[in-house]
Amino acid sequence: MTESWLGRILELEVGPVAHGGHCVSRVDGRVLFVRHALPGERVRAEVTEDKGGSFCRADAIEVLSGSEHRVTPPCPLAAPGGCGGCDWQHAEPAYQRELKAAVVAEQLQRLAGITRDVVVEPLEGGPLGWRSRVRLVAGRDGQAGLRAHHSHRVVQIDDCPIAVPGSLDTALSKRWRPGTELEVTSDGENHLHLRELATVRGRTQGKQLSGGMAIQHAAGRDWRLDAHGFWQVHPQAADTLAELVREWAAAPRGGVAWDLYAGVGLFASVLADQVGPDGQVLAIESGRRAVSDGERNLADLPQVSWRSGRVEHLIGDAPTPVDVVVLDPPRKGAGRAVVNAIAEGEPDRIVYVACDPAALARDVQFFSEHGYSLTDLRAFDAFPMTHHVECVALLQ
């Protein structure tokens, strides 16, 4: 068995960025995924994870030759051994977007065989103070903090520069039972909602400590919903995505549309406006609370019908023929079975909202097997300072 490299210090030439936010380097036939580095740099790195095999992970602990795009992180904890939340605070914001664009383009080429230039667009508001939902955990001293990267270790914080300003003050000012997990949400009215989390029989449950019903604004509507249910964490993301879905879906008057992985019905509301009272919109969502919130918020749109359950279990009963399908699957993507079921409905247009470029590329390849082509794609920096990127793809 090969001797473990864990803890080993290596001098590395850093290569391109990889999916997941690490940069790639190679030593003695092995691949190293390096955090806190940038392409083209020369660094000293400490191996932080080695499970054997062809790759391991490392942190850049000293920059020997830095990139012109390197900056001082706005948070001192965005460093080796610090908080695990941000990946690229050490890069200029514009360069962060270039790195994300490179990842999206590489995944499309590698997994879908598509060569395409990608531009990641910034959202209004800048790279700090945008995160409206934060999960904290209490350390041994009862002080709430954030977890280190790939670790249960709690890093104590005084604040978080990417969080909505002031949103963490209450949680950080108190002492909690060690191990307590907390979720803080700031809604569209800047109301704060604090929940204590617990895992019971493998399911996350919450005890509301303050707030509870959030008010959000998007797609020309006011939304009243569970503060801790799914909603885009960037304040500008929901409206940006809804308007692009409106443009690309172009559902015909009196037509049929599906909104898959519908959440509370943000995109269903857009589709309902397009098809009108004589059309049909089917919204499928597995979260029961989200369905309840969606039914209440869209009660004025009788053309929207809701189904609660997993998309792969319910899509077979969806009304056909369908004119347009919008889907916003979880990070793992829709998968071949759901793609096949969508294709059987023969929609003219498919609008795919994706939070993971690899899953998007795999599903685009599955759609291509049914004759669908990627005709447009836009990407948004809905998660500044992290490696995450939100994409919207149009397939026809």
Locate the predicted segments by residue.
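A structure-centric signal for secondary-structure junctions around beta-strands
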Residues: R131, V389-E390
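Conserved beta strand-loop-helix elements of the APE1-like EEP
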Residues: A393-Q396
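Accessory RNA-recognition modules of RNA-modification enzymes
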Residues: M1-L327, K332-N340, E346
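S-adenosylmethionine
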Residues: R307-V389
